[in-house]
Amino acid sequence: MREQIDPQVQAIVFTHAHADHIMGLDDADLRLQAARAGPTVPRGRRRRGSRWARVYSYAFDERTDELHSRPQLEFVRIGLEPFELLGVTVRPFRLMHGRTPVLGFRVGDIAYATDCNAIPAESWPLLADLDTLVLDALWDEPHPTHFNVAQALEVIERVQPRRAFLTHVSHRLDYAATNARLPPHVRLSHDGLRLP
């Protein structure tokens, strides 16, 4: 949030409903509402028993004041089928975050794969012919639910993207020192990073 949200952002796609990925939803909604011209985005059907509904119960309660307390966002459940979003095809693919299945996404020649420590066999074809791979790499030590830097570099070696950015990085990795030891086409991501 420190880098602000570009007022041109029209959609946010979530990989999974863990707290570190969804807890900024209210802030994102407020900033996007301020930039939005015209009516708010219509709401989709919301599943009352979902993790989203437990965390954001007020957003799923029809009695909550529509304009003041409920996010003015449409919630759409995503499966593994490709879908169109704002004229662009998004191709979801399965990743494993320990024993928890999560989603990665491919848009054009960019793939985003965070919070993962394994890539199932059926997902590898969606990582072929990439320009840019954004990949989880928590820190240097082994971890039960995240790739570490060495494992991420093995994935990058197999995928062969033109460039790669490591994301979901811990404070244990010094930005300058880590970038200095990475291959030239691999860098740590940073707040405010924009991919064309």
Language-model-detected regions and their locations in the chain:
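Binuclear metal-dependent hydrolase catalytic cores
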Residues: 1-113, 179-196
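Short, surface-exposed beta-strand-loop junctions and turns on beta-sheet-rich folds
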Residues: 7, 119-120
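Thr-Gly-centered strand-to-loop micro-motif
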Residues: 92-93, 113-115, 135, 166-167
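Binuclear metal-ion centers of metallo-dependent hydrolases, dominated by the metallo-beta-lactamase
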Residues: 120-196
